[in-house]
Amino acid sequence: MTLAEFWPLCLRRLHDMLPHGQFAQWIAPLTVGEEGGVWVVYGKNQFACNMLKSQFAGKIEAVREELAAGRPAFVFKPGEGVRYEMAAVEGAVEPAEPSLHAGSEEMPVQEVLLDELPSEKPVKPAASKTAADILAERMKNLPHEPRQAAGPASRPESAAVAKARTDAQRDAEEARYEQTNLSPDYTFDTLVEGKGNRLAAAAAQAIAENPGQSYNPFFLYGSTGLGKTHLVQAVGNELLKNRPDAKVRYMHSDDYIRSFMKAVRNNTYDVFKQQYKQYDLLIIDDIQFIKGKDRTMEEFFYLYNHFHNEKKQLILTCDVLPAKIEGMDDRLKSRFSWGLTLELEPPELEMRIAILQKKAEAAGISIEDEAALFIANLIRSNVRELEGAFNRVGASSRFMNRPVIDIDLARTALQDIIAEKHKVITADIIIDAVAKYYRIKISDVLGKKRTRNIARPRQVAMSLTKELTTLSLPSIGDSFGGRDHTTVMHGIRAVAKLREEDPELAQDYEKLLILIQN
């Protein structure tokens, strides 16, 4: 089978397999070619190729095997090839658009992967850049030069006029933030990026520049204290900076619930509906709290449809993946997955250090590298606790008139946290945690099996034991089924190397550290 024969059939299979929006945005525009006997799928840039490979390569390979197209697996690279039309299916009819009214039959929607970038509808060609284009540029960290003011320099104004202008600007800004409920401190400039939030931050900036298009809704989830509120409010602040006339509102889901119930009690339901429909961007934090409240969920269902149909941007946060919100209306779960769903991960060591340094800079305090490393190693779970720890150390610095935070000051200010963190951690506790995390038996960790799915967790457990306990290498060996200390040393070195080379293992290790210590 030639590429010209295979690709139109593959397009048909993928069209039937994927949600309509995903196919239209990611698959339909692809071009293909053949280089040195290898079939190639071309993306518009490296970022697009990486996303195609991670999300769709397996599906394309499955179709290739199904059609017995005896070629090696596709490779993905930036470039331009040949565009083929999708193979027709005789008598095929496109499915009708589902009704959006309550009780209507739902359109099946595929669950969104954590790092997938789907679109709810095919985006019509337009002169302006799409959110996908902007996101690709952001991920490549393209520099943006500040715009220079044009025209001749204005005449210097008097101090009184300047003060009046400043006061008026401040009053206008305060009024704007009172209307939007946004915090002026939550901006992209004050956001620290790391592995755990880099993709979400890039997506958020793209949405701020082109709201209501490809990624609607933007659904951000993760544990408490990871910076979800900062990131979503930064979208609102950035949009207002670019479009001061935009109507933006941030709120917690509790406020939405109370607002709806008040409208029901006061018989002002129509006013309530119009109030929320006016916004260009609506941000609701902790949307999971509307679960189990049937009337509230019903009303939000209609509000969601309005935002979707009018291409107004909706941003939601939650502590879990949409599909895992127990008690949430299935129709809402489905619609939450129409846009872009991303997870925020706990900050890695480098990001925690960067957060501390940025906080110190904002507070006008100097922090020594050793002190920043100490605090970052002490507080691993989330950004909120890390900032709280810094605030305590910063307060001690001011009260003691010490402009530089050193490790001794940090230890003194955080001594109660240190005492709590230094609870007795044993090899048995670590072995149990690792076994549960990797879903293997404790007997396997302690046993003689050397298969990869057993040996690697065993080495991770040994390395964690070395880091979190005071046991010697021979004692660690005894705790792991009587192994020789050289075996323990080899395992620890192997894990140290893998943490530098394998991002997935490094993330697993960091999560286990947090689980065991908390």
Swiss-Prot record:
GO CC annotation terms, alphabetical: cytoplasm; plasma membrane
Residues given in the record as ATP binding sites: G225, G227, K228, T229
Region feature Domain II, mapped onto this chain: 73-180
CDD domains in the record: AAA, Bac_DnaA_C
Subunit structure: Oligomerizes as a right-handed, spiral filament on DNA at oriC.
Free-text domain note: Domain I is involved in oligomerization and binding regulators, domain II is flexibile and of varying length in different bacteria, domain III forms the AAA+ region, while domain IV binds dsDNA.
UniProt-recorded name of the protein: Chromosomal replication initiator protein DnaA
Organism for this UniProt entry: Neisseria gonorrhoeae (strain ATCC 700825 / FA 1090)
